[in-house]
């Protein structure tokens, strides 16, 4: 009788924990979807040259958009004071200004929405003691990263308000990289709550070895994302619009024309695009190799599915990247390429989770 009662209590506790974990995981995945949208909107904001249209940072008051004609005139006048207007958009009409303003406004508004969607459930779960100390620490860490991302966004915008017509490529890349880190943290915690144990028929040592390979690939994809941030930051995609060669060269001659030499990796259009291409080539060889190795093991169906999706997303992303380059970075394909980077990264994270 005591044994039966013990099992009943244990079952109730287990079911309650499972429900809590499922709720938290769904909430985190919703936040992931919002961050995905944020990355895409941020990419469009950059591609349309809209990022400097709002020259102030007002986290609360800035939520209210301009309503009257006077409000719009004030905002346009503030924009006229920065170098980008003087050197690129001089003579811009109010209607033209509205076109770039709304992209930056929605980008910031989406950032505020993400903060709200994360903060309110986070406080609820903590107050109701739905999370243990370990999980609570992870969720708090993600919240702190989100706050830092808001500061990083404004720090990036500041770099284009005084002396430059565009934001710093260093700060842009840091802003993009931090978005991917936040996304990865939420996705990893969520998938861990949904599927804490993986069952494979394959030899555990072989699965661990494949898992190490997957983590290396994920790191390489993240590194490629950072490289893409530099490409975007210095508009390197507008040059060398040929493939597979760079205007007739596999290794172009202008790779190290800047001094000191290390500046070329960040400021030289030729070198920055070359680096991005080389990382892409490396992934084009290593991910299919990983896929073939995974096929040789008896993985779970979800593990096999994750590996298939990784290969599919690689092919999709390569096609989008080449098309974007050949067409000199059109808005639609460039935005799709940035979205593809998130999806490729997601597939790699899921593979790592399935092999962990």
Swiss-Prot record:
Classification via InterPro entries: COX15/CtaA_fam, HemeA_Synthase_type2
Pfam families per record: COX15-CtaA
Main location: membrane
Residues annotated for heme binding in this entry: 276, 337
Cofactor(s) recorded in Swiss-Prot or TrEMBL: heme b
Bilayer-spanning residue ranges: 24-44, 106-126, 139-159, 174-194, 216-236, 272-292, 309-329, 331-351
Superkingdom per UniProt: Bacteria
Family membership: Belongs to the COX15/CtaA family. Type 2 subfamily.
Summary of subunit composition and partner proteins: Interacts with CtaB.
Protein name per Swiss-Prot or TrEMBL: Heme A synthase
Organism in which the protein naturally occurs: Nitrosomonas europaea (strain ATCC 19718 / CIP 103999 / KCTC 2705 / NBRC 14298)
Encoding gene, per UniProt annotation: ctaA
